[in-house]
């Protein structure tokens, strides 16, 4: 019945939201531990075994902080902007397939909140809309550093959203769909190349698109080495300079949830998602997403921050032409049927 499907969708969405929040909390622990190892330190190890309770302690500390509103801020917009960023962040996970249906008490439970035929466009649109929380927060703060950080973020998203979308056109051409379910099914086929039989993961047929997607995704999420909107040495803390307490935590939560959603999306689009060598399952998706999350941390530990002119030049002079080249090559391959794609 329709009402049963509706209730099941709400329940799956509620569970997914709580899982994302839990993963976000322990993503901070994971990042600090990995960075510490790379820098020959120990990392958080005092609160609980191996420091596993550190995210809880950090959350309690943030909730206990005073929520300060600057005197020259636009109060209403200042208060709402972080909530907007946080509310939009987990919505992208709603269209990511976490597996096939699950039978429980005679009811089929799809491991997917919403199956829409333009799922990838939906995720890209959310990425574009998410910048409104940043620009509104920077503008409403009444601080020049905050405003400059917000303007940087807007320009960065406009530049790299274009690269991100164009990098996926090759995947759309090969799969013939914008639905993540259809893209996942196409990758579950086997690819026969002479004596070799390989999974039809798009990282094999679209290596350039994969590299472009990774670079653009790091820039979209404002992570190092593309963290220009919150560059401490130039802008204090960028667009959230004036935020404190739990409102600061909303921006913090949104950034890490965006990282997790982008990692899940990359794993689904290029690495077969739940597809694995022995048996399909959500654990394969989790393992692949963990690889991308480690990639984020590794970049932060190894690369210095780009200059702003370098950041914009990379997008418009290097990545955009390469994305257009990849579309042309993929179209020719599809037209001529090379490699039985």
Curated annotation (Swiss-Prot):
Topology in membrane: Multi-pass membrane protein
UniProt subcellular location: Cell membrane
GO CC terms, sorted: plasma membrane
Record GO terms (molecular function): NADH dehydrogenase activity; oxidoreductase activity, acting on NAD(P)H, quinone or similar compound as acceptor; quinone binding
Record field: transmembrane: 6-26, 76-96, 118-138, 157-177, 198-218, 252-272, 278-298, 313-333
Family, as annotated: Belongs to the complex I subunit 1 family.
Protein name (database record): NADH-quinone oxidoreductase subunit H
Organism whose genome encodes this protein: Thermomicrobium roseum (strain ATCC 27502 / DSM 5159 / P-2)
């Amino acid at each position: 019945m329709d009402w049963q499907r509706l209730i099941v969708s709400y329940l799956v969405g509620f569970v997914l939201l709580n899982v994302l929040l839990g993963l976000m909390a322990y993503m901070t622990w994971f990042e600090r531990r990995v960075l510490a190892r790379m820098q020959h330190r120990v990392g958080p190890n005092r609160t609980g075994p191996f420091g596993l309770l550190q995210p809880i302690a950090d959350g309690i500390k943030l909730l206990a902080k005073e929520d300060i509103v600057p005197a020259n801020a636009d109060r209403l917009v200042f208060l709402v902007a972080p909530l907007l960023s946080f509310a939009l962040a987990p919505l992208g996970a709603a269209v990511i397939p976490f597996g096939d249906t699950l039978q429980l008490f005679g009811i089929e439970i799809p491991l997917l909140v919403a199956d829409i035929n333009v799922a990838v466009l939906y995720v890209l649109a959310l990425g574009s809309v998410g910048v409104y929380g940043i620009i509104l927060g920077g503008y409403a703060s009444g601080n020049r550093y905050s405003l400059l950080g917000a303007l940087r973020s807007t320009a960065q998203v406009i530049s790299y959203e274009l690269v991100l979308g164009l990098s996926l056109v090759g995947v759309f051409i090969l799969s013939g769909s914008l639905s993540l379910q259809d893209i996942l099914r196409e990758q579950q086929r086997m690819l026969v190349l002479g004596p070799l039989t390989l999974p039809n993961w798009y990282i094999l047929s679209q290596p350039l698109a994969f590299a472009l997607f990774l670079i653009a995704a790091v820039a979209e999420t404002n992570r190092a080495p593309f963290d220009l909107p919150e560059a401490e040495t130039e802008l204090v803390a960028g667009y959230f300079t004036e935020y404190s307490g739990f409102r600061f935590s909303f921006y913090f939560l949104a950034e890490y949830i965006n990282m997790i959603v982008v990692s899940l999306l990359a794993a689904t689009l290029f690495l077969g998602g739940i597809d694995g060598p022995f048996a399909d399952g959500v654990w394969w998706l989790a393992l692949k997403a963990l690889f991308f999350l480690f990639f984020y941390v590794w970049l932060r530990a190894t690369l210095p921050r780009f200059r702003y002119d370098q950041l914009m030049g990379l997008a418009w002079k290097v990545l955009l032409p390469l994305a257009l080249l990849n579309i042309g090559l993929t179209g020719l391959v599809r037209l001529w049927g090379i490699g039985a794609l």
